């Protein structure tokens, strides 16, 4: 159950929100960051399926991180990102032990608002579709 797909390495960005769900993994793609994890009991509801809130939180993280990659590539300076809207369509269910990937497949950059979409897959099969809108925070002026 510890086999990690090729290209994934331990995710280095830590957060109190995601700490209970470790280990998390990341794979850098050309224009985004794909998050991954193996479904464990701590991720699951009483039916041994990943909880919808868990899927939503990691989809939000993957989209925000991928947006950061795109903003850096565009040399757009920002002081941070804030999720202003997040929706998920649950398309199926995952099971204990499956490999989950959170892959951002659409990013539209704006000057103050950005839009993203992601697909959540369990062993390669889509189980959720996420959409988020992010507000770009102004970068602080150098003192």
Regions found by a protein language model. Name each.
Residues 1-143:
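Terminal targeting signals and extreme-terminal segments of soluble enzymes
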